[in-house]
Amino acid sequence: MSVRGYSGVQVISSRKHRSMSRLPTVLLLLASAAVLAAGGQEATEDPFADETDQCQISVSAETMKSLHGGSMQPDGTCDNLWESFLSQFHQVRENLTACQERAAAGPAPDPSSQFCQQLLDDAQRQMEQEHRQYAATLEEQLHAAQQETQQEQEMKKALQKQLDALTDSRNALYIDLLLANIAIGETKQALSYYNLMPASMPIDKLHEQIVRFVYRVTIYQDQRLLNLMRFVRDIPSVEERRSLYQLAQREVQKRPSQRDGYVAAVYALSVREDLPVYQANRQLYDDLVRQSETRLKEQVANGNFKQAAELAARQPQHFRQLQTSLATIELKHWRKFDRFVPYANALPQPAQRLEVLRVLLSQIGDREKKTSHKYLVKAARQFDICEQFIGRGKVDQAVKKQLEELRGKFATFAKGKNYQHYLSESRKSSG
């Protein structure tokens, strides 16, 4: 069925278009028609304007009925029908707009959901509060633990400091006892304290301290050095012995009183007796021994017996290694015989004196066979002094036997002249 157009728009309802029955499509068409109608009304206001193009929309009767909820009258006028369409369209549009806004704003909360949400929020707040309280408690406990740990660390440091101080005091005491025993010659006791030194203590520093102590007091330095030599021999470590020997040698070389005296000889002979140390650098110690021996021989030849006598008294074992050499007068000093001959009785022990007399008589026989008289007279005088010295003490049979052998030696130089002859001559010359 065809209906007259409204404002340039025709709406045609025909049964042969029943296939177009979906509401969204019709609404779209109606919206388009409304726009076109508005434009058409504006155009018709001008009486001289050409007639606008008409838009024809075909709507089935079933669709029209569905739009009106089945209440549409088929015989209604087109204007009424169109007004009804527009009214319903606007209503639907408003409903759709409101629905869209509600959808965008979110669904309305359900009262039961609101209650559950409140419970959930309360539980969340309570959990957060408990969490804050628990975190605060843990923070306090952690702070207390840190303070306790710091206090314990401070106590530990204080105890360690006290322990270190006690250890230092103990080590200082050991060193003092070590040095004191070296000073008095108690080498075994000194070695026991030496072995108590901690491994953490640098051994070279300890050795330097020992040697400095030896030379701390000048009047005691010779005896302390001799004690040190005896102490060093008992140290098990070859390297430690070598270290102490080298430090001592430097000090000996600095001091003429030791370098030119018997102390240097004792030092060098001590090192030579220590084979592991001596073999490491023999030339160094051999040179020192020769230098010391040469100086002592020069002193004895010039009538200076002090150093040789001290060596014989303080280090008889070391003196024994040099006594024959010291008793032998070099040819260039033979003319100083008068100065040299009293050397025999400058020595402290009978065996040492007899050895000098033996070497002296042997040299007279080798050098002055034909002109021995004046030398034997002087030798007889020293023999008499030696015999009196031996008679005042207790001596073994070996010394007495050697004394008689030397007495008989005087008779071998000239026929009919014995010891008594030369002794009488010496008493005459001395007046």
Curated annotation (Swiss-Prot):
Glycans are attached at residue 95. Female saliva (at protein level). Female salivary gland (at protein level). One of its GO terms (cellular component) is extracellular region. Keywords: Coiled coil, Glycoprotein, Secreted, Signal. Residues 1-39 form the signal peptide. Disulfide bonds: none annotated. Disruption phenotype: (Microbial infection) RNAi-mediated knockdown results in fewer Plasmodium falciparum sporozoites invading mosquito salivary gland. Homodimer; disulfide-linked. This is Saglin. It comes from Anopheles gambiae. The gene is SG1f.
